[in-house]
């Protein structure tokens, strides 16, 4: 048997010099160009007259397995290890950022920022292999600058902090999301 992605098969008889017959096979060379999934019977004829003998062989053309690598995905470079899921299970993952091909572990930090083509390959019980790809976009972290350290007096006077890029969100004790801070005691915040 062969897989449907096989270009051609040359049938070989034990005794050369005979003739092949059957749908699509070359009579002299025994070359059959694979076109469709199914069973194909070919006859080999050798000899002449009362010494004419024939034999048949069946070639099975197996379909490729249907393989899915999933939908395209995006991760931040610091997202940590991600598990890719393909179907059917039991295949192998390859590509930049894959750190364990059999379990589909993808590390965005290893891949780095950019768009990466990841391949999932699967071999079925007929030894037919097929694959699918998924695009994984790894986004780099934005540059963020909270500005210079600032010394304030312990007075209830609000100060608006500024960072770059603008329109970020501030998080901390005594500060609003918009960056307004009112001192409330001595110390470092």
Q: Where does each model-flagged region fall?
A:
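Proline- and Ser/Thr-rich low-complexity, intrinsically disordered segments
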Residues: 1-189
